[in-house]
């Protein structure tokens, strides 16, 4: 297929933008076979089928570095609540009552939303055993998305230093969770033509003993298994590290967690020493920046400006539906740019170009994937198109990169191609029956809430 007449943000090493550009993906190929001006490619490949993307902005598929697949069924169930109440009274109670069918439907729902809003690759943070990892893998394979599924690794049920706070009994796992993660890796890693990866989803500091951390790291490094972990998300995390006579990054460094294919989510409460350790000893460690979640839960604002100044690899993640409400990474990208401008009183910092890099090429670096994140010959054919050509709110359309970050939302995504296959065409998801999924999500969400005995009410009276 020859995708023609697009304006292409390549994110290649010279950051070229091709006006009236085209991308060739040959029949049966999963890589970009050629890219350039439309006139040239049409003349060279006269027998290829054409799909016109005239007026569309084409860019690499978005990479979301921090996602909770199961939490889509918890959407809007815990808004405007303090963190501990949010966790104990709603989120953990509902997740602790999941069935494996809930896990499959929730995975489908999260993935469908990501696909329709331009995310082509994601990292799942901590998929619990009770959710049924087979269902998550099935959802990834069926949908066409790329997914790094972090199977939860834990042996402590508490939250940071909150000794009186424990997870719902339905979510508690022991050190055998590491063995289960290894088994899942052996069984599922590489499925779906390589689109499925199984990672270790270390819960949080405080949720994993030092002994289990060290075992996990040893196995991960020996087998090139990715690790993702919530880290320094809330002030209580900082208190936990202090109780161990550590800062967040001295703790991670001591345990051997820092290194390639380690994605640390949130990283809000860091000090100068932490940033210097990441800069000098990170060895490819990356950060999943989640500004919407951190804002909605009152966790704080991550030191994004400082991390980028030290060339730390920072990508972007949407987190989960109870703390974000959508999986629209384009909205997350806008927030990621705006927050540091307001915090530092400087509108020039973290510009649109840097944000696009975070959502594409930086995400690829975080995953250890040199075949993703930019549009170049030989790289995976993962790209999206946004149609702003006839939108009132986008006119007059000038700077394309700026438009992606400050104007576009997931609703503007018209085309999604992953692994060379057309997944979304003219805003229609081709791999999942949307009406059927919506119906299933409503039913499963209702039954789950009833089973968990969670009462969700707004503050205003419904009559």
From Swiss-Prot:
Entry GO terms, CC: cytosol; nucleus
A molecular function (GO) term: hydrolase activity, acting on carbon-nitrogen (but not peptide) bonds
Keywords assigned by UniProt, alphabetized: Hydrolase, Metal-binding, Zinc
Family annotation (InterPro entries): Amidohydro-rel, Metal-dep_hydrolase_composite, Metal_Hydrolase, MTA/SAH_deaminase
Keyword Transcription regulation (UniProt): no
Chain sites annotated for binding Zn(2+): 66, 68, 230, 319
Protein family per UniProt: Belongs to the metallo-dependent hydrolases superfamily. ATZ/TRZ family.
Name this protein carries in UniProt: Uncharacterized protein C1F8.04c
């Amino acid at each position: 297929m020859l995708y023609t007449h697009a304006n292409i943000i390549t994110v290649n090493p010279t950051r070229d933008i091709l006006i009236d550009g085209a991308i060739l993906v040959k029949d049966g190929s999963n890589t970009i076979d050629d890219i350039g001006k439309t006139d040239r490619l049409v003349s060279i490949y006269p027998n290829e089928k054409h799909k016109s993307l005239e007026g569309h902005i084409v860019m690499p598929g978005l990479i979301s570095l921090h996602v909770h697949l199961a939490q889509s069924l918890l959407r809007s169930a815990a808004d405007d609540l303090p963190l501990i109440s949010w966790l104990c009274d709603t989120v953990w109670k509902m997740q602790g009552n999941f069935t494996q069918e809930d896990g499959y439907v929730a995975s489908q729902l999260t993935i469908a939303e990501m696909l329709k809003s331009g995310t082509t690759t994601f990292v799942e943070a901590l998929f619990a055993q009770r959710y049924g990892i087979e269902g998550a893998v099935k959802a990834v394979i069926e949908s066409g998305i790329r997914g790094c599924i972090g199977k939860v690794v834990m042996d402590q049920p508490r939250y940071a230093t909150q000794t009186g706070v424990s997870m719902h009994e339905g979510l508690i796992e022991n050190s055998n969770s590491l063995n289960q993660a290894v088994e899942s890796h052996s069984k599922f890693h590489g499925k779906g033509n390589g689109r499925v990866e199984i990672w270790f989803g270390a819960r949080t500091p405080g949720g994993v003993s030092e002994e289990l951390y060290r075992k996990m790291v040893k196995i991960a490094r020996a087998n090139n298994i990715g690790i993702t972990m919530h880290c320094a998300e809330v002030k209580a995390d900082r208190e936990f590290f202090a109780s161990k006579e550590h800062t967040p990054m001295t703790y991670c460094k001591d345990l051997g967690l820092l290194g390639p294919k380690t994605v640390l989510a949130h990283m809000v409460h860091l000090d100068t020493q932490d940033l210097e350790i990441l800069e000098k000893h990170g060895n490819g460690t990356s950060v999943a920046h989640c500004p919407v979640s951190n804002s909605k839960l009152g966790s704080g604002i991550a030191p994004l400006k400082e991390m980028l100044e030290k060339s730390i690899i920072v990508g972007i993640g949407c987190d989960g539906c109870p703390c974000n409400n959508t999986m629209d990474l384009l909205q997350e990208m806008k927030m990621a740019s705006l927050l540091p401008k307001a915090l530092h009183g400087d509108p020039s910092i973290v510009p649109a170009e840097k944000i696009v890099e975070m959502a594409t090429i930086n995400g690829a670096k975080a995953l250890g994937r040199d075949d993703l994140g930019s549009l170049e010959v030989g790289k995976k054919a993962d790209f999206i198109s946004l149609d702003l050509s006839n939108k009132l709110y986008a006119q007059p359309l000038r700077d394309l990169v700026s438009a992606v970050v400050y104007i576009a939302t997931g609703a503007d995504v018209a085309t999604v191609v992953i692994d060379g296959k057309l997944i979304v065409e003219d805003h229609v998801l081709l791999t999942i029956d949307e009406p059927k999924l919506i119906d299933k999500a409503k039913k499963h969400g209702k039954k789950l809430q009833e089973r968990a005995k969670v009462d969700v009410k707004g503050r205003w009276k419904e009559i």
